[in-house]
Amino acid sequence: MATAQLQRTSMSALIFPNKISTEQQSLVLVKRLLAVSVSCITYLRGIFPECAYGTRYLDDLCVKILREDKNCPGSTQLVKWMLGCYDALHKKYLRMVVLAVYTNPEDPQTISECYQFKFKYTSNGPVMDFTSKNQSNEPNMSSADTKKASILLIRKIYILMQNLGPLPNDVCLTMKLFYYDEVTPPDYQPPGFKDGDCEGVIFEGEPMYLNVGEVPTPFHTFKVKVTTERERMENIGSGILSPKQLKTPLQKILTDKDDLEDDQEHYISDEFDTETKMEEQEKNPGCSVRREAGFICEEDEMKSKGSPDFSISHSQVEQLVSKTSELDVSESKTRSGKIFQNKMANGNQQVKSKENRKRTQLESGKTVLHPFDSSSQESVPKRRKFSEPKERI
């Protein structure tokens, strides 16, 4: 038992540096948070088969981590895309990664679900910070609170993915990278990517936007958002979203003010009521399955130098962490049971522009999102640089 606990602690340390006192340590953490987030989403949404994942423990939470596998070309390709993301992150060019799901290999512009991972770069101090709508002005957190905040984000992803309706049986993936144009060289492309063509996308059904959470540091801020079909939200009721989120007007849910102030209720927030879901899991202990695997971040863990000790109390984080402290991965809830296909295509789907997110309903009932992304960097929309994968599978 002691040996198993030691191994789990070691695996957790592999993902999260003990301290965030330098920009390099912060970069390592952000890369690994991106890796864990993408891995959890693709696993829980049933994108790739079991063999494409390894296992790591984040304290008491067992997570699946995507890895290269000769029997799953799709996972190998996605790992290569992630390495391209790391290159752009390291150079401080990367602003947003969009991972999109679509169903027709010949029509990657019509998407069924997408996940946005946003990045900001700052340089305000030596300790990572975690903020929310109610904590934006609080002081920096200790390293222990930083770790709790990061794990909390992963737990939230798990809870959301476990309760969304299943994807279609046969889906494809594509990835888009967006940049801070004022600092990114016009000819820059990460390894494995090429210049993309921004055209706007069509969303199958009626889109719902969910703000999953963020983990800021003095050097980086990492945010996660999800867009899915309204029909898949049937299980996201009062037991998961608080009444406050459920009262959010539809007009606001469908308005993405993006980088202006993400937290001003333009998305459904993800402060899920996890207590109800934990009670359900306790009633069905036989459904919980722990699993195993590897990790796609290959950097050595940074040797951190001492950081100041900020013993700040954050009751909201503590409460949410305690509510989800027993969270397990339930196979009956997480896998959609779809037919696994190793075809992945690079499409022209795009994240919703904050000012241009006016929705137009087609006769077919699909929603046009115009155009993909014109963030707060520009007051006048113009074509923004973005990249898409060179190869499709």
Swiss-Prot record:
Keywords noted in UniProt: Chromosome, Differentiation, Meiosis, Nucleus, Oogenesis, Phosphoprotein, Spermatogenesis
Where does the record place Basic and acidic residues bias? Answer: 352-361
Q: How is it modified after translation?
A: Phosphorylated at Ser-376 in a SPO11-dependent manner.
Q: Which GO terms describe its cellular component?
A: chromosome; nucleus; synaptonemal complex
Phosphoserine sites (modified residues) = 375
Where located? Nucleus; Chromosome
| Region Disordered, annotated ranges | 322-393
Please report the stretch or stretches of sequence annotated as the HORMA domain: 24-226
Motif mapping: Nuclear localization signal: 382-385
What GO terms in the biological process aspect are recorded for it? blastocyst development; meiotic cell cycle; meiotic DNA double-strand break formation; meiotic recombination checkpoint signaling; meiotic sister chromatid cohesion; oogenesis; regulation of homologous chromosome segregation; spermatogenesis
Q: Which InterPro entries match?
A: HORMA_dom, HORMA_dom_sf, HORMA_MeioticProgression
Per the entry, what this protein does is: Plays a key role in meiotic progression. Regulates 3 different functions during meiosis: ensures that sufficient numbers of processed DNA double-strand breaks (DSBs) are available for successful homology search by increasing the steady-state numbers of single-stranded DSB ends. Promotes synaptonemal-complex formation independently of its role in homology search.
**SUBUNIT field:** Interacts with HORMAD2. Interacts with IHO1.
Extract the PANTHER family matched here.
HORMA DOMAIN-CONTAINING PROTEIN 1
List the protein's name.
HORMA domain-containing protein 1
Q: In which organism is this protein found?
A: Bos taurus (Bovine)
Gene designation per UniProt? HORMAD1
